[in-house]
Amino acid sequence: MRRPIIAGNWKMHMTPSEAVKLVDELIPQVKDAKAEVVVIPPFVDLTEVNKVIQGTNILLGAQDMFWEEKGAYTGEISPLMLKEIGVKYVVIGHSERRQYFGETDEMVNKKVLSALSHGLSPIVCVGESFSQREEGKTFEVVLSQTKEALKGVTHDDIVNVVIAYEPIWAIGTGKTATAKDANEVIKAIRNTIASLYGKEKADLVRIQYGGSVKPENISELMAESDIDGALVGGASLVASDFAKIVNY
């Protein structure tokens, strides 16, 4: 049985003091959650948030990382740094990284391999744009991104990878793929993983949906057979909203 994973990506929100306040509010509201709960604050908040979540059921994620351990890469953060401050999950290839910072499939793949080699679980984001969807290219785009991201990932490591299907047209727009549509794409992603790693492994990989996930639509999404959780954006910035999603 795959344990659902619900992660809150705070993006570029919350100063360290605001982050601590948010997590303090969240802890009692999610303590009985059946799903795995992950918060993903900005880098500067990670240390403070990690102190607050010690001894709770909340795990720590980071929004990105570089693939090298150290070096002359101004502005970058390495997997070693993240490990030392208690990070367990790293979002890789978010559409905003691809769109604003020129991240390519090749860069995403390097980051995935580096994260795994340092014992971090990547949350690998894939998803199509509105125009790609209109042109009927959803499956082509998403499955290509999935294959590229997983190049070189071993049969042992694939179970430590989480995939997040985030249609770009649904992020922050209030538009959501229907639960049925999302499940179809996620099922195709799982079948692609099965073609690379076998069905047994593919059935262990958790695949989330992301894109305007809210308390109002989470139960419908989670009722689908292949959706194993959610990567939540805006709704994760309000403790009560995120708790409702976690406790769907």
Curated annotation (Swiss-Prot):
Pathway: Carbohydrate biosynthesis; gluconeogenesis; Carbohydrate degradation; glycolysis; D-glyceraldehyde 3-phosphate from glycerone phosphate: step 1/1. It comes from Thermoanaerobacter sp. (strain X514). GO terms for biological process: gluconeogenesis; glyceraldehyde-3-phosphate biosynthetic process; glycerol catabolic process; glycolytic process. It comes from the Bacteria. NCBIfam families: tim (TIGR00419). Its EC number is 5.3.1.1. The active site is at H94 (electrophile), E166 (proton acceptor). This is Triosephosphate isomerase.
